[in-house]
Amino acid sequence: MMRIAINGMGRIGRLLFRRLIDNKEIELVAVNDIMEGDNLAYLLKYDSIYGTFAGTLAHQPGAIEANGKVVKALQQPNPALLPWKDLQVDVVLECSGSFSSREAAEQHIKAGAKKVLLSTTGSADIPLLVYGFNQHALTKDETIISPGGCMTNCSTHILYILNAIGIKSVQCNILHSYTSRQELVDAPHKHFRRGRAAAEAIIPVEIDLQQSLERLLPVLKGKIASVSTRVPVANGAMADFTIQLEEDTTRQEINKLFATAAANEYKGIIEYTEDPLVSLDIKGNTHSCIIDGTLTSVVGNHVKLIAWFDNEYGFTTRMIDWLGKM
């Protein structure tokens, strides 16, 4: 049985805890975060998005007990000092966001873990592997991998499929729920807009999606522009693509392309729908992207494509998929 530890118990780390605690093929042996254990137990039990934990959960000295299983709870800020060797940890899920370079992530390896799976796009010297796209490129010798982020996992499949027709340019706006890297009330921030009240404003932010997509799809280098617009909701996202193709197409052709992909080689990764969804409807959806066929529009060779995704639940599903490959 694979032995797992989670470093960083923010939104992604806590959701992974909830989803892995009863996994029959994985043993969650430890979590690490600088927050106090009783506070961690509280946040694991009561979640403002996904509701109350379905089972028993309580804090013990140095541990969290969930559904009768005891998970060691550590508070070590230096990953090199974590007891991964003693705990025989196979894979560390690095969810803190603070150790995404190879040098930083290798601290977990030096501490005794066999492998590290980031929860974000890592530095350029870490393989960027998107599940459902290039997961077969993973080698047994690779100890640190990056699965991209939620936006990369949504966008990669869409652009790859459309590039079968031929893409001349892509403009992408990710309408995304606010995150912990924004302020709830106006406050100082090195990125001024992120310092504005997240629940009261529509806030454009810069993202590195373009760079990630160009790493994965080098044929599109210089053809992609992206931005994220943070909106006053706590969960969910909608990717808005404006794509110029090499040739004219139709709404029917584009929708058929994605409906076919969702039913076949991308089953479980892409979902296609013609239901009149809103962001609340995709909470808990496990797909990397949900193509909304009702919102597809085409003018000549210009395509407007809309895809929903649960930025937390969909992405943690892909991280769990990766554990099956490691």
What are these language model-derived features?
Residues 2, 226, 238, 242-326:
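C-terminal active-site/capping subdomain that shapes the small-molecule cofactor and substrate pocket
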Residues 2-195, 319-321:
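N-terminal Rossmann-like NAD(P) cofactor-binding subdomain of oxidoreductases
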Residues 3, 7, 11-18, 27, ...:
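Active-site-lining helix/loop region of Rossmann-like oxidoreductase modules
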Residues 64, 129, 144, 185, ...:
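Short clusters of hydrophobic/aromatic residues that line enzyme substrate/ligand-binding pockets
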Residues 71-73, 224, 305:
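Generic structural signal for residues in well-ordered beta-strands
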Residues 99, 124, 208, 249, ...:
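Short alpha-helical
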Residues 148-149, 202-204, 281, 309:
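Hydrophobic alpha-helical scaffolding
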